Amino acid sequence: MALYTPEYQPTGEEIAVINTSKGPIRVQLAGNDAPIHVGNFVELAQKGFYDGLKFHRYVPGFVIQGGCPNTREATPEQVAAGRAPGMAPFGTGNPGYSIKEEFTTNPNNSHEDGALAMARSMDPNSAGSQFYLCLGPQHNLDS
């Protein structure tokens, strides 16, 4: 999959507001520490890519994950079950590209409680649209 470089240049002042059925989540985006990831996240949000997507993974004390386009048409019951008949598996969708990793190039990028990070596979350059929020410090994910 081709690596995408966002056009959006973060100012370091970006705040994401994720509206959920439980209320809004506000997150300060670290545009100075992860400009590619923040630029990509902002562009996807501005295009409406995240509209209607559901959080598809919740592991108490670890993470809550969203941003998979495969959840767009899923019902809450299907998301809770972790699957929907006839639909691509949750957690496998992407925007059609991936972005370059930034976690090894900046020591400020750490998984503190409440941190927002991009989900990826074992390939460090495989992040696209999926993200997770840390539910407690997750320093085992820092490398």
Question: What does each model-found stretch correspond to?
Answer:
Residues 1-143:
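Cyclophilin-like peptidyl-prolyl cis-trans isomerases
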